[in-house]
Amino acid sequence: HTTIQAAVDAAIIKRTNKRQYIAVMPGEYQGTVYVPAAPGGITLYGTGEKPIDVKIGLSLDGGMSPADWRHDVNPRGKYMPGKPAWYMYDSCQSKRSDSIGVLCSAVFWSQNNGLQLQNLTIENTLGDSVDAGNHPAVALRTDGDQVQINNVNILGRQNTFFVTNSGVQNRLETNRQPRTLVTNSYIEGDVDIVSGRGAVVFDNTEFRVVNSRTQQEAYVFAPATLSNIYYGFLAVNSRFNASGDGVAQLGRSLDVDANTNGQVVIRDSAINEGFNTAKPWGDAVISNRPFAGNTGSVDDSDEIQRNLNDTNYNRMWEYNNRGVGSKVVAEAKK
């Protein structure tokens, strides 16, 4: 196959429940890749010595018009009726809104349960070509369950990695939470770098804040965890790096609706001096709900009691971290 999308289409057309493996030769592959829902899982792996040897990239802005998006995403009829990924493309190209929005700004989008990615780079190359305003530019979006990502670079600026629970209608759902494991990887961006409603474990992964576009506060995590679900994002044995002194925050809740209370835990990780130790967590995006930490109360036995899922408080935690940015400083009482 001459394109990654053609290889994906061929694998999906087999309609088998057996895993299909796609080896990607070193090179730069410009354009989107859509992996549809299918009976079996798909594995894409780069055959180079390192992840940067295989680079999948395109410049897409969530603020662009559907017409401009169609021009950039579907040259020469890459997506056509009858092809496996047509339903994914059509859910975005048929929009009647002024802009395509964050969910359709992804360079690599998968709805495949059991997707595996290894040893490659996925980048939304919009980068610093736009101003500091709202410019969602997703590099990787996954909707499927039991996704595994290992030794992958995920590069962008705003909403670099978006983990949703959308169904085939391309809308957020309230009855399922897809699971993802990310290991030995590198994720880069500025605003709400990792966002969405999925449950994700990050192990031995580096998060790097690049604020050359915004020149202001940046945010690593923006979980949109449903309030009745206890687990969102977990980062363990990982590294958080930002340039400057206290310019970044670890995250904030992505309050997409009234049933959202983002959940994230960062533990056993290194956090550098680029993070705001006085206020490591920000106010919620969209709702502007002020951050409220849950310190609990002391009972008659001098034991601290607290409901970790109390909707009156945020669910964002740090445990056993190290580095200058890991020191939590209590704000003065008002």
What are the language-model segments listed below?
Residues 1-334:
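Sequence-level preference for short, compositionally simple segments enriched
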